[in-house]
Amino acid sequence: LTMIAALATGCAKAPADDGGSTNLTGSLADIVDKIYAAHPVDLSLGTENVDITDTAWMLPQFTGLTSAEGVKEAVVSEPMISSIAYSLVLVRVEDAKNAQSIAQQMKDGINPRKWVCVEADDLAVCGYGDVVMLIMVASDFAEDGITAQAMVDAFQSVCGGKLDFTL
């Protein structure tokens, strides 16, 4: 019941500090759960917090960022088997006005071949309020309905049908 309550309330919207778009409320893990409720992905996924202070490995490995400046928190959802090219990352930024700039840094810095033996050749980055989503997946999964666009659409649904940007 707790999970159902979290899913039902975890992604409410709150006014952004800058008076512009609204921000998603709830934890990033709750938002990931809502995305998967909107578009299930059957890849034995796990969702974990990203240590944004680890700028030597963890932050760039999962977000593409080399600095945590402007970042509040991040989570990554990936298969528990490391040779599957699928990664969904949510980053909450400190100021929604900087979300698109940080999203561009993520897109420019992410390594779609981080798995070495497989590559995520389908990539999208989008944002709403203070949350940026990066999704990358091997196009081999398109036949199963797992594409970057499908996950962008699911995130858009969680955001009430509107995104602030898509890169």
Could you say what each language-model-derived stretch is?
Residues 22-79:
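Surface-exposed, low-hydrophobicity interaction/linker segments
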Residues 34, 38, 105-113, 154-162:
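Structured segments of extracytoplasmic/periplasmic soluble domains
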Residues 80, 117-167:
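A short, solvent-exposed beta-edge/loop patch
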Residues 28-32, 99, 103-107, 148-152, ...:
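Extracytoplasmic/secreted envelope proteins and their assembly/folding machinery
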Residues 1-2:
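Sec-dependent N-terminal signal peptides
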Residues 13-26, 158, 162:
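Intrinsically disordered, low-complexity, charge-rich terminal extensions
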Residues 6-13:
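C-terminal motif of bacterial Sec signal peptides marking the signal peptidase cleavage site
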Residues 64-109, 113-116:
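Mid-length scaffold segments of soluble, non-membrane domains
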